[in-house]
């Protein structure tokens, strides 16, 4: 039985010359767990908004075709009624949290519908989402993962047949991401809910989903069982989707070396153990260490930071933190949600002040610096690029700080930055209306406009497809010609292992590990303690040989390949 059907669905946003959706025909069976994949801008979110009636009832435009959800025609049914059929959790889920306490928020939708059992429905939704016992907590006491689960509980309280989640784990560490997907699995298998996720993380799709829907240019390419879908490596990559790393490695081995393996291509590490079993013993090799840096750019000296909650309870973020960042380093700060990564950055740019201790730039205390001086030392690019846009055009945003400070030649400098970040053709467009990758490039141009010595980036690759990630990766490499020291806070372990020459691991406001990628990921106890997870291909290598330390598909192929000169090839590749 189909719970969702679309017939020739075509939709134009107001004023658009090209459709966001083109003749979409789809059937989704009741009880399915469907992942929707596709490049940024292919129409995934637009399609999902058509399922719960936001399009066309709330977001106007030209709507053609028919959408049926649990027997209701969305064009002839109001959004309030459809919300009880298809619950939606947005990518920016924090905007769905409306009430101060957990139970209050979970039951709020039911209260709006004047349901007499609103509190019971809220409690049941919290129980199903694993938040039992949190009913009286304030929402700001929750972790990022718990807040996401609360948004899900709010949608679930109306007891819809369909639950739609847009990028549910984009801002979460692996432990919180696992918890979200385990809850979704329970809702699907135990409560027979139909789950639809928009997702870039194909390793989670492989572990949890039943079918995959590929979209491109507003059209449906295909809907296939997950095992078959993720084996279409070339097709997925052409659409800027990362298949699981184990699948890419197997595909390349079969294509380049004629390795057959067992059965089809693996999509999980467990399947990979069988496929890669016939491989030869790995070549032993070491990655060259980066040149040792001596000069200190910034130092945290016995820094403590705490605050009191609304209940008057003290909460400590950092206690006697000591940390030095050297000039010229590429540093990745990692750790679970709530570990203190973003707070560390806010302290560095002066948005927060330490309760105790000091932060020094070139040996000079931050407390004695005015904002003009500090902004020349350090700049921060926020996780949400939209927060960087305050003017009507990209060019005006890039020029803003320089113009405000009377920087000589700021117009010429603006043109240089627009050209360097490939923004010249977009200079007169509103930054808020650009694509994901374009927004990131624009926010980076704004961040380095004053030529800071240190650049801080918070989650620079969140929610991005392959093409946009590669774009940002290239931009990060270009940073060495622009700014001296770069520090990123991220959950993206592929980026960490490919880019950083030093990794700092935070847990509960403490530095529990600090070193190279081998020193960090080679210590299983530490990474479990920190709630982080290495790239999937690292786990695949470890499953085949406990001494194997490979962080990219290329390194895996060189490590386990048959080339006699693999050691030389490897060194050439990583330098």
Give each language-model segment a name.
Residues 52, 349:
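Helix-to-loop junction immediately C-terminal to a conserved catalytic motif
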Residues 60-72, 357-365, 374:
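Conserved ABC transporter NBD signature motif
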Residues 117-134, 408-426:
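Conserved ABC ATPase "signature" region
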Residues 138-142, 146, 430-434:
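Conserved ABC ATPase signature
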Residues 159, 451:
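Conserved catalytic motifs of ABC-family nucleotide-binding domains
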Residues 163-166, 455-458:
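Catalytic Walker B motif of ABC-type/P-loop ATPase nucleotide-binding domains
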Residues 217-218, 508-509:
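Conserved ABC ATPase "signature" C-loop
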